[in-house]
Amino acid sequence: LDEDKIKELYIKKCYNRIQVHAESKQIKGKVVVVFNIDEGPKIRIAKINFTGNEHFKRRKLLKQMETRQKHFPTFIFPGRFDQKKFESDIEKVKEFYMNNGWLDVDIGWEIIYREDNKNMNILVHVKEHERYYVESLNIHGASLFTEEELKEKLKLQEGGPFYLDAVDKDTYQIRLMYGEQGYIGAMVKEKHTFTSEGARVNLAFNIDEKDRYYIEKISA
């Protein structure tokens, strides 16, 4: 064991202010490592709050996270704080914002210990910045479908928000439409560029339809 491993074990048991100091001693001619441990109080998450979240309610953001504040029944929701898990949760909240068009979102957080030394609050600071929108949407290389037929099946639309996760989904949707018509080798490449004015995106899908496949024979 080392200091970090010991701290990790205690933190899993809600001793978030654990202090561990290792020192070496000579005992009967042998070097012995002694760990001095100050457990501190057992602390649980009493509340998780957000600031700066103008477009999403607290409850919506909490749903993106695995970390839960303490509430009944406490054996299921003990309010345990795991820093690695919480940092991963912060990334999930950031990804949620980006997938809804806030590509420049900044998120930070801080721990505030309560006076009772048994509970802590976590305050998450959100700076949303501007939301990105689709300035233009163009589809090149399509002959099987009209541009309008393809566009109406896409989540991303001109003038609408630039949903980051919709880029891959819409690329797949176009390939699916071609596959259903026998163009199973069709290739779709997406390209987006940011305009010089404001939070705007020019989006293009380039299609290489390839050959159409036919079923020659079906054997029983």
Regions found by a protein language model. Give the residues of each.
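Interaction-mediating elements
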Residues: 1-220
